[in-house]
A protein has these predicted regions:
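Catalytic cores of nucleotide-sugar-dependent glycosyltransferases that transfer UDP/GDP/TDP-activated
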Residues: 2-172
Length: 172
């Protein structure tokens, strides 16, 4: 991602890059979205509720405020799970914008109710509606609840808010 960002900048494009966690903000054009406390809170709540991707309200609002300032022509998403962004708030914001969206999928989390790798256990519930998830103990770990059916429905609704003309999916 950073190579693409730097290549765009070298060509005179006003490019910005944001990432979820682990590295501190470098400058105005290269910033971390999440606070450490936000990641821990999101991860902890998700472990109890199986709602990974639906917390981080404060960090998401701050990120979207930055996008409001930038007013991007294109938003290129990569993995949007990892306890740092609220996918509902992100996609509801994207639905109100005129920008194009490119989403590079590095795993299957976007199309399942819980897991990023359904093929590990040969599960095909994601095709018709997740439930009784066999991978709650794997990433993203959920200890007490199985919300895979609700998550699958919510993600399906959110991730189809943008028309095919506005969003391009890429799978390496």
């Amino acid at each position: 991602m950073r190579n693409l960002h730097h290549d765009l900048q070298e060509k005179g494009v006003d490019s910005f890059i944001f990432w979820g966690r682990r590295h501190e903000t470098i400058n105005n054009h290269e910033q971390c979205i999440a606070s450490r406390a936000g990641v821990y809170a999101h991860g902890g709540l998700a472990r109890f509720t199986d709602r990974a991707g639906f917390y981080s309200h404060g960090d998401t609002r701050r990120f979207l405020a930055k996008l409001d300032e930038i007013r991007p022509d294109v938003v290129h998403l990569h993995n949007i799970h990892g306890y740092y962004i609220n996918v509902a708030e992100l996609f509801e914001w994207l639905a109100t914008q005129n920008c194009k969206v490119i989403w590079t999928l590095h795993d299957c989390w976007a199309i399942t109710g819980h897991c990023p790798h359904f093929q590990y256990v040969g599960c095909e519930r994601w095709k018709t509606g997740c439930h009784d998830c066999p991978q709650l103990g794997g990433y993203p770990t959920a200890y007490f609840m199985d919300q895979s059916e609700r998550n699958w429905k919510d993600k399906r609704r959110l991730f189809t808010m943008l028309s095919a003309e506005r969003m391009l999916l890429v799978s390496p």
